[in-house]
């Protein structure tokens, strides 16, 4: 049986942690930043985990990561 291809777009957006959770970056950080507060932009820099309902689908896209 052939290997499953990794979805390259998902590979650039998500990383698996040591415990198997999937990390993701926040949205709203690329442009139109002038009206956002420093605190909001600082908090958006922190990583977050994928919701539990999406975890299975994301893991199928990045099987070897």
Curated annotation (Swiss-Prot):
Protein name from the UniProt record: Large ribosomal subunit protein bL35
Residue stretches of biased makeup (Basic residues): 10-23
Superkingdom, natural source: Bacteria
Region ranges (Disordered): 1-23
UniProt entry tagged with the keyword Ion transport: no
Keywords: Ribonucleoprotein, Ribosomal protein
Biological processes annotated in GO: translation
The keyword Ribosomal protein appears for this protein: yes
Homology family: Belongs to the bacterial ribosomal protein bL35 family.
One example GO MF annotation: structural constituent of ribosome
A GO term from the CC aspect: cytosolic large ribosomal subunit
Signal peptide boundaries: none
A Pfam family recorded for this sequence: Ribosomal_L35p
